[in-house]
């Protein structure tokens, strides 16, 4: 199959298995959920009654004081006592096979092509790292909410896009399923397309 280059009167021949496969919604959902789960910190931590600092001595005798019976100053019902079901650090990551991950990326790329959300250009670069230059270039292409993928990371482009809320710049090796579906449009350079094809082959 062929992808038309927007900035040139030519087309790029690409693999049908990468850019023309059926959309597997269940697979994409599973991989996106796993990717998001892997990004969770899971570092919250509280102390149980065993971990709270304090004496193990009974605060006062069982009977005769008129006060409620108490066996420990670390009791969860006491102020500064331990937490009953204390939260502990957790690893939320889910196992995803390479074949599944690559399959999901291929599925997403194919769907982007079908929905006319993937724009392929010969090259995409800036003379200087100026946000103004990038905004003008995107305005010319009628783009606003966009992910730009280049073969090698273009520093000028990266620096110019840092200040734009709905624009992100990646190199081909750094693509992920969440970013591909998060933006309205995805702009890829011809060399980025070839790199992604090799990566997912």
Curated annotation (Swiss-Prot):
- Which keywords accompany this UniProt record? Ribonucleoprotein, Ribosomal protein, RNA-binding, rRNA-binding
Gene3D superfamilies tied to this protein: 3.40.1370.10
Q: Which InterPro entries match?
A: Ribosomal_uL4, Ribosomal_uL4-like, Ribosomal_uL4_dom_sf
User: Which intervals of the chain are annotated as region Disordered?
Assistant: 45-73
- Gene Ontology biological-process entries: translation
Which terms does the record give in the GO molecular function aspect?
rRNA binding; structural constituent of ribosome
Q: Which Pfam families match?
A: Ribosomal_L4
Which function does this protein serve?
One of the primary rRNA binding proteins, this protein initially binds near the 5'-end of the 23S rRNA. It is important during the early stages of 50S assembly. It makes multiple contacts with different domains of the 23S rRNA in the assembled 50S subunit and ribosome.
Quote the subunit structure annotation.
Part of the 50S ribosomal subunit.
Q: Which family does it belong to?
A: Belongs to the universal ribosomal protein uL4 family.
Its name, as the record gives it, is: Large ribosomal subunit protein uL4
Tell me the organism's taxonomic lineage. Answer: Bacteria, Pseudomonadati, Pseudomonadota, Gammaproteobacteria, Enterobacterales
